[in-house]
Amino acid sequence: MPALDLIRPSVTAMRVIASVNADFARELKLPPHIRSLGLISADSDDVTYIAADEATKQAMVEVVYGRSLYAGAAHGPSPTAGEVLIMLGGPNPAEVRAGLDAMIAHIENGAAFQWANDAQDTAFLAHVVSRTGSYLSSTAGITLGDPMAYLVAPPLEATYGIDAALKSADVQLATYVPPPSETNYSAAFLTGSQAACKAACNAFTDAVLEIARNPIQRA
């Protein structure tokens, strides 16, 4: 795989809880209208978060839980654990299944990490969410429907790339995830027009590729 090839993620496990146990629902702090849960794991956390946001736009569901697992998919407790667990909550199993279907479609065909080099040892994500759903807009603290540049890379690459992205276009920093995260990456959510978010993604990509080509730049 040469640099910039997509790294397609996979769903590792999925189940529907048609009617959540009342005690469990209280423990999860579910609102009364959430009666069913969709559980899904995949081997790419950030792609799965974007897919979960897509589900909120296509079905009557909410993301009631979403967390990355420590140290990434390669170090999970089982092959089915993947890198992240998402719980979609909905009023009934049909809506939850519709949300899971939307997630699967996006995980298999939507946003994806890319290799920054031919050695395939450095991956990054620079993706424009053209219209945020309830999950990402709430996470980033932006207005529902606003575009977002979703940027992820290893710590130094992300730090350098986020600065380059912010300087490249009329975008604002909505959320910054400093290193180390659960998977030892760093990330940022930038907001602005779709065109500005695309320009920011391009600048971020260029910065990450520059470091991949020449990691140590002497003053």
Curated annotation (Swiss-Prot):
It is found in: Bacterial microcompartment. InterPro entries: BMC_CP, BMC_dom, CcmK-like_sf, EutL, EutL_PduB. Zn(2+) binds at E157. The record marks Y70, N184 as: Important for gating. GO terms for cellular component: ethanolamine degradation polyhedral organelle. Residues 45-46 are annotated as: Part of the acidic patch lining the small pore. Pathway: Amine and polyamine degradation; ethanolamine degradation. GO terms for molecular function: identical protein binding; structural molecule activity; zinc ion binding. Keywords: Bacterial microcompartment, Metal-binding, Zinc. The record marks D53, E83 as: Part of the acidic patch lining the small pore. Ethanolamine 1 binds at D45, E83, F113, T183, N184, Y185. Ethanolamine 2 binds at D46. It comes from the Bacteria. Residues 1-113, 114-215 form the BMC circularly permuted domain. GO terms for biological process: ethanolamine catabolic process. A component of the bacterial microcompartment (BMC) shell dedicated to ethanolamine degradation. Two crystal forms have been seen; a form with a closed central pore that has 3 very small (1.1-2.2 Angstroms) channels per trimer lined by acidic and aromatic residues. A form with a large central pore (8-12 Angstroms) has also been seen; this is probably a functional pore which allows molecules to enter and exit the BMC in a selective, gated manner. Belongs to the EutL/PduB family. Has 2 BMC domains which can evolve independently of each other. NCBIfam families: microcomp_EutL, PRK15405.1. Homotrimerizes to form a pseudohexamer. The trimers form a two-dimensional array about 37 Angstroms thick. This is Bacterial microcompartment shell protein EutL. The gene is eutL.
